[in-house]
From Swiss-Prot:
It comes from the Eukaryota. This is Deaminated glutathione amidase. According to Rosetta Stone theory, the existence of a fusion protein in one genome predicts that the separate polypeptides expressed in other organisms function in the same cellular or biochemical pathway. In Drosophila melanogaster and Caenorhabditis elegans, NitFhit is a fusion protein composed of a C-terminal Fhit domain and a domain related to plant and bacterial nitrilase. Residues 46-298 form the CN hydrolase domain. GO terms for molecular function: deaminated glutathione amidase activity.
Length: 327
């Protein structure tokens, strides 16, 4: 089943910023193995990105097969970059299984993804790899590592999730990520890609605007939050947080998500999406595994920042420099 989502007319934006060029874009949401697809856009020269939605299980090879199918479809449709969600490699039943299934960055699974990137000729955002770091022997804990591969399969950036999700939501059950995971020590400077400069984050990080502001002030044009939101927080907070991060940073926001039931103990909300710098959801996945596509218009982003120069109007003398730019 296919569904088209078209950017609505920005009547109020045109009134606010009469010189602002509003791109007329359409994007496509697809389930795996569609029979035929077409992208309707008046700006086909703009870079195309694909956002993949999956239901990971403890079966790593089956998960890879599912992700590879979506990545190959994204490449066939002309995407230059495909985003995979947090825990694209697996979602285990408990912390002990998580540690058992984890691998180092130089392990077999990441090698399969480097080969996939080379085969398809596109960049991959691997949104949350269960990484056995160099301190594995000492800590017996892993990192939730966002890995960015270029089209030649080389690792160009790694970001280890800095905010761990230790929460207890009524109706959703407790989560204590720190039982098996170490927090990352630092942020990663934005990385230049064919779609624009990308700032890396992971899931729960989106609740801390300082991180997003720091990445934006360091030059990010696209913020990405690969996630595995639950069934209670998802409907209440998912879209609201993503749109807020896009509006306050004037960045595109790309959020690949886990969806559906992973096993008897866990399910995820889904609703992967792309939000533009005005805060409009310009692409959204349908229910179940699949992908959605959106074009990134950096000229639109720059015009919006000129017409609404919020970063020039900040008052750090009053409230400090929240989200201090990265060195």
């Amino acid at each position: 089943m296919l569904g088209f989502i078209t950017r609505p007319p920005h009547r109020f934006l045109s009134l606010l910023c009469p010189g602002l060029r509003i791109p007329q874009l359409s994007v496509l949401c697809a389930q795996p193995r569609p029979r035929a697809m077409a992208i309707s856009s008046s700006s086909c020269e703009l870079p195309l990105v694909a956002v993949c939605q999956v239901t990971s299980t403890p079966d790593k090879q089956q998960n890879f097969k599912t992700c590879a199918e979506l990545v190959r479809e994204a490449a066939r449709l002309g995407a230059c970059l495909a985003f995979l969600p947090e825990a694209f490699d697996f979602i285990a039943r408990d912390p002990a299984e998580t540690l058992h299934l984890s691998e180092p960055l130089g392990g077999k699974l990441l090698e399969e993804y480097t080969q996939l990137a080379r085969e398809c000729g596109l960049w991959l955002s691997l949104g949350g790899f269960h990484e056995r770091g160099q301190d594995w022997e000492q800590t017996q804990k892993i990192y939730n590592c966002h890995v960015l591969l270029n089209s030649k399969g080389a690792v160009v950036a790694t970001y280890r999730k800095t905010h761990l999700c230790d929460v207890e939501i009524p109706g959703q059950g407790p989560m204590c990520e720190s039982n098996s995971t170490m927090p990352g020590p630092s942020l990663e400077s934005p990385v230049s890609t064919p779609a624009g400069k990308i700032g890396l984050a992971v899931c729960y990080d989106m609740r801390f605007p300082e991180l997003s502001l720091a990445l934006a002030q360091a030059g990010a044009e696209i913020l990405t939050y690969p996630s595995a939101f639950g069934s209670i927080t998802g409907p209440a907070h998912w879209e609201v947080l993503l749109r807020a991060r896009a509006i306050e940073t004037q960045c595109y926001v790309v959020a690949a998500a886990q969806c559906g039931r992973h096993h008897e103990k866990r399910a995820s909300y889904g609703h992967s999406m792309v939000v533009d710098p005005w805060g409009t959801v310009v692409a959204r996945c349908s229910e179940g595994p699949g992908l959605c596509l959106a074009r990134i218009d950096l000229n639109y982003l720059r015009q919006l920042r000129r017409h609404l120069p919020v970063f020039q109007h900040r008052r750090p003398d009053l409230y400090g420099n929240l989200g201090h730019p990265l060195s």
